[in-house]
């Protein structure tokens, strides 16, 4: 079972994420909520979630800063970004820090459910219930080409 932490500064949206998805049907349980990255770091220590669903733009500590702090602490939690900010800079930063998905608001509960199902399939394929520690990108890593493509698209479109 995946333990989920929902990080969103807008309470109505945060509660909507918690209530809109049939977490039990996805073999998940929401173990905590946080209104910003600082609260999320405390919640990670307390609940040890395996999945963090987070906004990017939040007061005190944004989602990118939170992911950097999680990486520095060796967190093995998967991260799904759920944000209204569709900037390639944000997407690129989130991917570099190990985000497994990037969803845009407004979203439908089906989109979030699909992202969780995709993650569960990835976990099953890896044969583990937690992600490997967020690794540094290695030279020659195929994901660099994805990041380069995103950079190109951001510059030319």
Language-model features: where?
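Two-component/phosphorelay signaling modules centered on CheY-like receiver
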Residues: 11-32, 46
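Non-catalytic signal-transmission and effector/linker regions of two-component phosphorelay proteins
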Residues: 1-3
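Conserved acidic carboxylate
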Residues: 8
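CheY-like receiver
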Residues: 23, 41-148
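Basic, amphipathic alpha-helical hairpins
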Residues: 150-157
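Structural signal for short hydrophobic segments within the conserved structured cores
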Residues: 5, 29-32, 101, 152
